[in-house]
């Protein structure tokens, strides 16, 4: 009531602005937000969730917060979610078991959506399928093992072919393979893809040249 009076609008307008349901970002919305800030008012998301079944939260599960890819992903996702008046809930798990626990925990918090970056070698199909019918889930990278989950990733076969083709076009006659020490199906598949395209484009390689490790 005080926020509405200070902003000079109705209580219903205050509710729509602060809940994110009012599409316009105009002078009225700015007055409401300024009045709420001035009066120290904050939205009770738990109470709002009970009334609307919307928690205004997005869950993000990653293997590590220190990896460059994960750090960049956080830098991109958080401002976007903040712009949409959402809250980001982060779960970090370096193993399949840890990530499954984080996914379950976030789902039990009734997040409105879930973004998952699988850990190396993690098969989260069972866990993701368990919640995919009622929770929008997007998987970033990794193999698509859960058919009801959207996946944003790289066509690694096409990428490897483009790399080997480029080497061949530059007159390179041989190449070695260097990768991390991740022992996963994805790593083995990519290594096999490398050999396939090396043979296709007539480039030489040797098992003695291959290096794995940090």
Model-assigned labels for residue ranges:
Residues 1-55:
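N-terminal helix-turn-helix DNA-binding module of bacterial transcription factors
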Residues 8, 110-111, 171-174:
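Short loop/turn motifs at secondary-structure junctions
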Residues 11-16, 50-66, 166, 173-181:
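Short beta-strand segments enriched in small/hydrophobic residues
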Residues 27, 45, 71-73, 101, ...:
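Generic recognition of short, well-ordered alpha-helical segments
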Residues 35, 76-80, 127-131, 189-201:
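Alpha-helical structural signal in soluble globular domains
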Residues 56-165, 169:
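Alpha-helical recognition/docking segments in bacterial nutrient-uptake
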Residues 81-92, 177, 195-214:
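Short beta-strand elements in bilobed, periplasmic/extracellular small-molecule ligand-binding domains
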Residues 161-201, 207-208:
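An alpha-beta-alpha
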């Amino acid at each position: 009531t005080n926020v509405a009076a200070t902003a000079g609008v109705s209580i219903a307008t205050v509710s729509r602005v602060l809940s994110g349901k009012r599409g316009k970002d105009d002078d009225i919305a700015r007055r409401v937000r300024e009045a709420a800030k001035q009066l120290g008012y904050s939205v009770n998301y738990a109470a709002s969730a009970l009334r609307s079944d919307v928690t205004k939260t997005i869950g993000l599960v990653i293997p590590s917060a220190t990896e460059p890819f994960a750090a960049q992903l956080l830098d991109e996702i958080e401002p976007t979610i903040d712009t949409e008046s959402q809250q980001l809930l982060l779960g970090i798990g370096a193993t399949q078991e840890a990530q499954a626990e984080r996914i379950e925990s976030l789902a039990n918090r009734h997040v409105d959506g879930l973004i998952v970056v699988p850990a190396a070698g993690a098969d989260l199909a069972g866990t993701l399928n368990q919640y995919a019918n009622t929770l929008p889930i997007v998987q970033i990278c990794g193999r698509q093992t859960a058919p009801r989950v959207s996946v944003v990733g790289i066509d690694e076969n096409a990428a490897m072919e483009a790399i080997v083709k480029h080497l061949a076009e530059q007159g390179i006659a041989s190449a070695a393979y260097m990768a991390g020490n991740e022992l996963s199906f994805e790593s083995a598949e990519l290594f096999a893809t490398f050999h396939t395209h090396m043979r296709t484009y007539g480039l030489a390689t040797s098992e003695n040249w291959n290096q794995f490790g940090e």
